[in-house]
């Protein structure tokens, strides 16, 4: 019989429930049995741990080793909470001998136990090992707190240790997270010292906003900050540029009765100095006495550095003096900034004195400051002091670098001590310093400046061999050397080589070449180069314009010179005395002294201050024109305008009075000089002797000579040459030779001008070419031959009609490195025209112009006259027109001849 479906269902359900109940009872019984067995197992292991049996044997049994789990170890460690050393031994034994993988909880239980027993070092080591597992800070905290509760602890020291470890491990943000979990989840508070370390860790990693947030959290849970925490907070506020709150924090710290020290005040002083509120910082330092605090070395150094930042170097020096009086040893940064500031202010002596004083404290400025100080001393021409400072560097153990040596090498080169400069270069190499282009540039410039171009070329070659690329400075220095020797073509070749390498010329390059081109008389090339500056985006400066002005003045083209003065001022470049001086001299040299006076007066009305050199040119102009009264009037105006007459001015006036035989003025000037306490120098005495020698008044000339010696002035080669020249021209050649022989014993060596006096006599009048050639050969041996001496010899050959020998002499002079000039060629052209050999004369003319030598007025007149005599009227007219285009005025003879030719052609 079948049961109804419902009954079957009820019966089935009842069976299942009954089964579940039975199963649950069985499971519960089994769990209780397992727990009991685990407890028995743990107790057994505890007995082993605390017993005297060998752990190696007891714990190696299969019964123990197979059953031992992490939960068992945790229970055993909790059981050793009062004997953490035993627990640590057990922990380490399992790890080292059984390779047991301990749980995080086991680590945390043992850390708690060790900290409780004040065993912080092993606790810290254990914590470090745990954190190597790359666990999340929250996971570590949760397990650590769970174990804290299981162990029924009351101290939060383990959590402090965790935060401190995160700070030491540069995981400051993880430390902050632990702190926040402590105060929000479990109401535990770290120690103040832990929070101080955490806050300073945030400051160290520039988490200033988080540092402030941490501080606020601390205060909100009732933690009372100490001075170290306040210091970190004040530093954070200063870094956040919130100086108002920083000052409020100082006040709050003082109000809470916190045991303060100087450190937070130093931090605030530093913050104020960085914001350039130095005087407020100085005020805080002054107020320290009222707080029973004394400024320390940090206070002073911070203030010195801050004062230097706002350019208050004098006050900074006073602060440094105060610090040194207290026997505080200043920092290198404070000393360096103050020394550098004083140096920039031009107070080199104060800077040097400070360096000497701080050496006693074992402090010295850094190498950069020493280099800058040595450089300033060199620029101030205090070379001895620069060398002493360099020596002092070695004594204090400060090793010079390549910059130091470069500065000193440059100094010695500028002074002409080229051998010393070379020895320093060798010292650089010996000390293993890397050579740069700078010392080579100095050596090249120095050797060019003192005339040794071949050595300069050698240094440039050495540079290139050392794979050092010449710079624009290198090229410009060598160009300047070539220009000074009259080798303008070499200078121009070097310029094209430089630009061909893609090195852009500087303003100094252009100015150097322009000066050289003007000296060589290559005006058109100078103008072309001046215009080329724009192509290189180089703007002319005052010096460039001064070169252009002076160049045109020396050529006598005053209108062009004034055009450049106008252009200069229109471009906003203010002229200086170097601009005006050549204009004044140029006007005077072209017979326009009165116009020069008008120009000078105009400058005075325009508040342009002229120096005595400018006025000397004007005095020279009036004296040259015989206008001595006007010259004396200028002297009065000079005094009224605050310009003192110097020896040069008096020399010009004395020379003028002698040339125009104004004895009254001459003696009046000597008396005036005496009344002013001025003694004639060798230049004035030589001028007086020269004037008397030229008039043949040798008795008076030698009388002045004796007076010169009695007054302590030694005659030089110019003085000797003046008398020798006068004697030669007066026909007293033997006496001149005797005087010349007396020069060397008194350290006056005859120069090319001296020998030129004899050469001039031998090649004029009764020409004695044999003696002239012998003398010139002697001049050549003494390396004294120049263009003038060659010209005299050429003139002598031409006068004797020995044109071939004269022509050979031109070839020889070029071979000797002496450049022919316009006079050289004009002398030859004149002789060729005299012989009616106009064809060769024109060929020589073309050769001259192709070499870049500009013909002068005499040259044009000579060749034009020769062409007219030879019937070459077309060429004569062509030359006259060219002459006029050059701004040169033909003489009367040339004008008459060519004008009559023009009239004949028209008719």
From Swiss-Prot:
Residues 887-907 are annotated as: Disordered. Keywords: Repeat. PPR repeats lie at residues 103-137, 155-185, 191-225, 226-260, 261-295, 296-330, 331-365, 366-400, 401-435, 436-470, 471-505, 506-540, 541-575, 576-610, 611-645, 646-680, 681-715, 716-750, 751-782, 786-820, 821-855, 856-890. SUPFAM superfamilies: HCP-like. Gene3D superfamilies: Tetratricopeptide repeat domain. Residues 891-907 have a biased composition (Low complexity). InterPro entries: Pentatricopeptide_rpt, TPR-like_helical_dom_sf. Pfam families: PPR (PF01535), PPR_1 (PF12854), PPR_2 (PF13041). PANTHER family: ATPASE EXPRESSION PROTEIN 3, PENTACOTRIPEPTIDE-REPEAT REGION OF PRORP DOMAIN-CONTAINING PROTEIN. Belongs to the PPR family. P subfamily. This is Putative pentatricopeptide repeat-containing protein At5g59900. It comes from Arabidopsis thaliana (Mouse-ear cress). The lineage of its organism: Eukaryota, Viridiplantae, Streptophyta, Embryophyta, Tracheophyta.
């Amino acid at each position: 019989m079948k049961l109804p479906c419902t009954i079957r269902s009820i019966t089935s359900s009842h069976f299942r429930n009954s089964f579940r109940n039975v199963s649950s009872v069985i499971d519960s019984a089994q769990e209780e049995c397992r727990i009991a067995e685990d407890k028995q197992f743990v107790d057994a292991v505890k007995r082993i741990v605390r017993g005297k049996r060998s752990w190696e044997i007891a714990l190696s049994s299969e019964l123990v080793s197979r059953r031992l789990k992490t939960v068992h170890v945790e229970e055993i460690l909790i059981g050793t909470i009062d004997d953490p050393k035993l627990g640590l031994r057990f922990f380490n034994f399992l790890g080292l001998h059984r390779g047991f993988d301990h749980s995080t909880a086991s680590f945390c239980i043992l850390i708690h136990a060790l900290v409780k027993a004040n065993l912080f070092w092993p606790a810290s080591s254990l914590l470090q090992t745990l954190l190597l597992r790359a666990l999340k800070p929250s996971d570590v905290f949760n397990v650590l707190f769970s174990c804290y509760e299981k162990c029924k602890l009351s101290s939060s020291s383990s959590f402090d240790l965790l935060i401190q470890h995160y700070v030491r491990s540069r995981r400051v943000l993880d430390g902050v997270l632990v702190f926040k979990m402590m105060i929000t989840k479990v109401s535990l508070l770290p120690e103040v010292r832990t929070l101080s370390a955490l806050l300073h860790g945030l400051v160290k990693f520039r988490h200033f906003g988080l540092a402030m947030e941490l501080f606020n959290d601390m205060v909100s849970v009732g933690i009372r900050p100490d001075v170290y925490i306040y210091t970190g907070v004040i530093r954070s506020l200063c870094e956040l540029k919130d100086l108002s709150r920083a000052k409020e924090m100082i006040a709050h710290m003082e109000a809470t009765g916190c045991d303060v020290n100087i450190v937070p005040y130093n931090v605030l002083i530093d913050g104020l100095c960085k914001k350039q509120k130095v005087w407020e910082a100085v005020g805080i330092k002054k107020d320290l006495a009222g707080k029973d605090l004394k400024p320390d070395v940090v206070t002073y150094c911070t203030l010195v550095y801050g004062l230097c930042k706002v350019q208050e170097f004098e006050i900074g020096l006073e602060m440094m003096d105060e610090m040194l009086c207290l026997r505080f040893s200043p920092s290198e940064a404070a000393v360096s900034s103050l020394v550098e500031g004083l140096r920039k202010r031009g107070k080199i002596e104060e800077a040097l004195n400070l360096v000497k004083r701080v050496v006693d404290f074992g402090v010295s400025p850094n190498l950069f400051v020493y280099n800058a100080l040595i450089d300033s001393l060199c620029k101030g021409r205090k070379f001895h002091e620069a060398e002493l400072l360099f020596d002092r560097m070695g004594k204090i153990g400060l090793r010079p670098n390549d910059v130091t040596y470069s500065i000193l090498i440059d100094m010695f080169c500028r002074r002409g001590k080229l051998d010393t400069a070379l020895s320093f270069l060798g010292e650089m190499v010996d000390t293993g310093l890397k050579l740069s282009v700078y010392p080579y540039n100095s050596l090249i410039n120095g050797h060019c400046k003192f005339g040794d171009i071949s050595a300069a070329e050698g240094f440039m070659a050495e540079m290139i061999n050392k794979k050092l690329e010449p710079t624009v400075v290198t090229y410009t220095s060598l160009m300047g050397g070539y220009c000074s020797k009259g080798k303008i073509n070499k200078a121009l070749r070097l310029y094209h080589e430089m630009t061909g390498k893609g090195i852009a010329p500087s303003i100094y390059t252009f100015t150097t070449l322009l000066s050289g081109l003007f000296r060589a008389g290559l005006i058109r090339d100078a103008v072309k180069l001046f215009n080329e500056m724009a192509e290189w985006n180089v703007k002319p400066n005052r010096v460039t314009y001064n070169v252009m002005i002076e160049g045109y003045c020396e050529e006598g083209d005053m209108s062009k010179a004034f055009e450049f003065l106008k252009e200069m001022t229109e471009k906003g470049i203010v002229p200086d005395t170097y601009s005006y001086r050549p204009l004044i001299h140029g006007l005077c040299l072209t017979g326009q002294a009165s116009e020069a006076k008008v120009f000078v007066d105009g400058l005075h009305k325009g508040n342009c201050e002229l120096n005595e050199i400018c006025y000397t040119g004007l005095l020279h102009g009036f004296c040259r024109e015989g206008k001595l009264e006007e010259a004396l009037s200028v002297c009065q105006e000079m005094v009224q305008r605050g310009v003192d007459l110097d020896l040069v001015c008096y020399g010009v006036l004395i020379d003028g009075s002698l040339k125009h035989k104004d004895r009254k003025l001459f003696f009046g000037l000597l008396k005036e000089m005496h009344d002013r306490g001025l003694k004639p120098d060798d230049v004035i005495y030589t001028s007086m002797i020269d004037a008397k020698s030229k008039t043949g008044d040798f008795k008076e000339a030698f009388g002045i000579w004796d007076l010169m010696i009695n007054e302590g002035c030694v005659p030089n080669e110019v003085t000797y040459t003046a008398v020798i020249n006068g004697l030669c021209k007066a026909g007293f050649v033997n006496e001149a030779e005797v005087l010349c022989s007396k020069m060397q014993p008194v350290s006056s060596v005859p120069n090319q001008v001296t020998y030129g006096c004899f050469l001039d006599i031998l090649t004029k009048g009764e020409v004695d070419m044999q003696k002239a050639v012998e003398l010139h050969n002697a001049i050549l041996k003494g390396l004294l031959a120049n263009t003038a001496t060659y010209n005299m010899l050429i003139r002598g050959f031409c006068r004797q009609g020995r044109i071939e020998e004269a022509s050979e002499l031109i070839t020889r002079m070029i071979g000797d490195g002496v450049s022919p000039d316009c006079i050289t060629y004009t002398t030859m052209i004149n002789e060729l025209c005299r012989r009616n050999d106009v064809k060769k004369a024109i060929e020589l003319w073309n050769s001259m112009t192709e070499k870049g030598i500009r013909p002068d007025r005499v040259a044009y007149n000579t060749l034009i006259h020769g062409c007219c005599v030879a019937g070459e009227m077309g060429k004569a007219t062509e030359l006259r027109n060219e002459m006029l285009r050059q701004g040169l005025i033909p003489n009367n003879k040339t004008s008459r001849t060519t004008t009559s030719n023009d009239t004949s052609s028209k008719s």
